[in-house]
Amino acid sequence: MAALRPLVKPKIVKKRTKKFIRHQSDRYVKIKRNWRKPRGIDNRVRRRFKGQILMPNIGYGSNKKTKHMLPSGFRKFLVHNVKELEVLLMCNKSYCAEIAHNVSSKNRKAIVERAAQLAIRVTNPNARLRSEENE
């Protein structure tokens, strides 16, 4: 079967590709890079002084048409069993299935087989599948 392609694949434009880093995380090891909003009364970043690191705000949001879209052009839908896969039957050109991390390898095989029958793309079909020579 040929590779499943989305119905439309618009160009995904990100307004910012760099991560927003936490104020003074480059100075101290104990301060992690994960973003935290500065709340100090004298904080330069919170007051948006020129030359300081940028704060995330609504203006950096993605286009509504391409929000949550994968580079392949599909949107992800988390699947835990074969029954949940049936939901994607009518919208298999815009959504792809992603098998949840806590699904057993036996159920994964069943989900991947059923997805092939329904022409639904699976983002992680080879996860946790052992090859025959290892068994």
Swiss-Prot record:
UniProt key word Repeat: no
GO MF term list: structural constituent of ribosome
CC per GO annotation: cytoplasm; cytosol; cytosolic large ribosomal subunit; postsynapse; presynapse; ribosome; synapse
Alphabetic keyword roster: Cytoplasm, Isopeptide bond, Phosphoprotein, Ribonucleoprotein, Ribosomal protein, Ubl conjugation
Chief location: cytoplasm
Modified residues (Phosphoserine): 62
Biological process annotations from GO: cellular response to dexamethasone stimulus; cytoplasmic translation; liver regeneration; translation; translation at postsynapse; translation at presynapse
UniProt cross-link Glycyl lysine isopeptide (Lys-Gly) (interchain with G-Cter in SUMO2), position: 9
Compartment(s) of residence: Cytoplasm
Modified residues (N6-succinyllysine): 50
Transmembrane annotation, as ranges: none
Record text on subunit structure and interactions: Component of the large ribosomal subunit.
Known role: Component of the large ribosomal subunit. The ribosome is a large ribonucleoprotein complex responsible for the synthesis of proteins in the cell.
Family per similarity comment: Belongs to the eukaryotic ribosomal protein eL32 family.
The protein, known as: Large ribosomal subunit protein eL32
Organism: Mus musculus
Record lineage: Eukaryota, Metazoa, Chordata, Craniata, Vertebrata
